[in-house]
Swiss-Prot record:
Protein name: Glucose-6-phosphate isomerase
NCBIfam families assigned: PRK00179.1
InterPro entries hit by this protein: G6P_Isomerase, G6P_Isomerase_C, Phosphoglucose_isomerase_CS, SIS_dom_sf, SIS_PGI_1, SIS_PGI_2
Molecular-function GO terms, alphabetical: carbohydrate derivative binding; glucose-6-phosphate isomerase activity; monosaccharide binding
Keywords: Cytoplasm, Gluconeogenesis, Glycolysis, Isomerase
Superkingdom of source: Bacteria
EC number of the protein: 5.3.1.9
GO cellular component terms attached to this protein's record: cytosol
Pfam families attached to this UniProt entry: PGI
Catalytic activity: alpha-D-glucose 6-phosphate = beta-D-fructose 6-phosphate
Principal EC category: isomerase
UniProt record similarity statement: Belongs to the GPI family.
Physiological role: Catalyzes the reversible isomerization of glucose-6-phosphate to fructose-6-phosphate.
Length: 559
């Protein structure tokens, strides 16, 4: 297939049509009140099949959300009014949909098959991408088979990825998630400016067998460069200055700065300005993943994402999983007013997935200004949080079941585990996931709780008092994402689903999901405060709180 950029113009949606569709949706919600999900299952024996979608072995079950056929139709009308399909096609055609930075958004190109063509500004992106992938694979194979050696001639045993944000969250999450496929060197991740992070990591490593991957597009990210400098000094102090070139590689587009650091261009893997940090796991930022699981498995990871890309690009509106997922998210956030969503993977190896999604979702859709420069009149992206099941059941599920806020839950489940000898234990995990989903929807009435207490031998008066505490309102919306097994392909498909879902929610909110200006002010102020904290500059034009905190810190340090 041949793709070609269609230029930079981006259509402006008809706000009157969108507002009319949104008001119709809100009137529908007010008229029907709070939907009783339990009643829907009683009235519609085909509720599950009518309110779920499949993509091969991928199942998206949204039957436990408080929506009806009418709701879905009104949501589809909203998608049409927002020109979701047109905006989707604009991304796939290479238009500069990142309007504030005037950039195309083409992480989707990173996972295109080698035999396809994607032209942007006269350049075939697929040719360039495949070239970098081939370079990554050659280098990865050398490290993994031991032919690439450190300065003292020893095989590389440990990899330390130094990055932050998208250069850390994605690689760390994916490497941990794909542990059963990890047959390469040990992988470690350093991101925080807290010196403890780099110090604790280095304390257990051998310099002669350690390779550092410095991941920074601009090679100016403060935390990353600070950690990289500590690592470089560590290598030089043990192996000498000449060892830097053998023990450091870079993933960056700033070749001049990489060279200044001491890393040769032959050990630098590049990526492009149309790759946003939180979408960069598919690029050379994923090098540490390839080092861990090998090139073939990494390509399976890309193919899984491409599978979801094709579905998102070609499936009709009503059968399109990312679009339906996004419309339900918009319904929960904007129409129902639910302020957060919990993502609970019933897979310990996906324990880092909620943190990964926090950046992907909240950095994308945590905006207050629309594409046409107006302040939003409704809530934008929700707070995203979660943990792995069953751990979360013993931590925060109390709030999900009986708290005063309704928090939609997104369960992620795999039918099988990798540990076949522990199959009965995995059955326990699956049973718990299904049970929690049902419990959130079904709840337990006060009367049922009272009967249960009486049956257990508790007297009537105490049963009456305890029944309220042991009742559950139920009717808590939740969705289930089910795949067969956590493989590189399955993980790639899951991540791509969330990428597209977040993009579509941004379209519905009429915001730019691909910039992140909100992180800049804090960086600027930190740069101003650092020399003051070090006593190099005097304080001025500071608020009393900042002045007081600085004075307290300096006094306690004895400065």
């Amino acid at each position: 297939m041949r793709y070609k950029s269609m230029g930079d113009s981006l259509s402006i949606r008809n706000e009157k049509a969108f507002e009319a569709a949104l008001q119709a949706l809100r009137r529908h919600a007010i008229k029907d009140g709070v939907y009783d999900i339990r009643r829907h299952f009683i009235e519609d024996e085909q509720r599950f099949s009518n309110f779920s979608l499949n993509l091969d072995d991928f199942l998206f079950d949204f039957s436990k959300c408080g929506v009806t056929f009418k709701t879905l139709q009104l949501l589809d009308d909203l998608a049409v009014a927002a020109d979701v399909l047109g905006r989707r096609d604009a991304m796939f055609s290479g238009k500069a949909i990142n309007t504030t930075e005037k950039r195309s958004v083409l992480h989707i190109a990173l996972r295109l098959p080698a035999d396809e063509v994607f032209m942007l500004d006269g350049t075939d992106l697929v040719h360039d991408i495949q070239g970098v992938l081939a370079d990554m694979e050659r280098f990865s194979d050398m490290v993994r088979d031991g032919s690439y050696k450190g300065n003292s001639g020893e095989k590389i045993i440990d990899i330390v990825n130094i990055g932050i944000g998208g250069s850390d969250l994605g690689p760390a999450m994916v490497t941990y998630a794909l542990k059963p496929y990890h047959d390469g060197p040990n992988c470690h991740f350093v991101s925080n400016a807290d010196s403890a992070h780099i110090s604790d990591t280095l304390s257990v490593l051998n310099p002669a067998t350690t390779l550092f991957v410095i991941a920074s597009k601009t090679f100016t990210t403060a935390e990353t460069i600070a950690n990289a400098q500590v690592a470089r000094q560590w290598i030089m102090s043990h192996l000498g200055k000449e060892a830097v070139c053998k023990h450091f590689i870079a993933v960056s587009s700033a070749l001049d700065k990489v060279a200044e650091f001491g890393i040769d261009s032959s050990r630098t893997f590049r990526f492009w300005d149309w790759v946003g940090g939180r979408y960069s796991i598919w690029s050379a930022i994923g090098l540490v993943v390839m080092l861990a699981i090998g090139g073939q498995n990494f390509r399976q990871f890309l193919e899984g994402a491409q599978h979801m890309d094709r579905h998102f690009k070609t499936a009709p509106l009503r059968k399109n999983i990312p679009i339906r997922f996004a419309l339900l998210g918009f319904w929960h956030r904007v129409v129902c007013g639910y302020a957060s969503r919990a993502v609970i993977p019933y897979a310990q190896r996906l324990a880092r997935f909620p943190a990964y999604l926090q950046q992907l979702d909240m950095e994308s859709n945590g905006k207050q200004v629309s594409l046409d420069g107006k302040t939003l009149t409704f809530s934008s992206g929700p707070v995203v949080w979660g943990d792995s099941g069953t751990n979360g059941q013993h931590a925060f599920f109390q709030l999900l079941h009986q708290g005063t806020d309704v928090i939609p839950v997104e369960f992620i489940l795999f039918i099988k585990g990798h540990e076949q000898n522990l199959h009965p234990m995995y059955d326990m995990l699956v049973a718990n996931c299904l049970a929690q989903s049902k419990a959130l929807m079904k709840g337990r009435s006060v009367e049922d709780a009272r009967r249960m207490l009486l049956k257990s031998g508790i007297d009537e008066r105490e049963s009456e008092n305890l029944a309220l505490h042991k009742s559950f309102a139920g009717n808590r919306p939740n969705m289930m994402l089910v795949q067969d097994l956590l493989t590189p392909f399955a993980l790639g498909r899951l991540i791509a689903l969330y990428e597209h879902r977040i993009f579509v929610e941004g379209i519905l909110m009429n915001i730019n999901s691909f910039d992140q200006w909100g992180v800049e002010l804090g960086k600027e102020l930190a740069n101003e405060l650092l020399p003051i904290l070090r006593g190099e500059n005097k304080t001025n034009n500071r608020d009393s709180s900042t002045l007081g905190l600085l004075a307290h810190i300096q006094a306690r340090r004895g400065e």
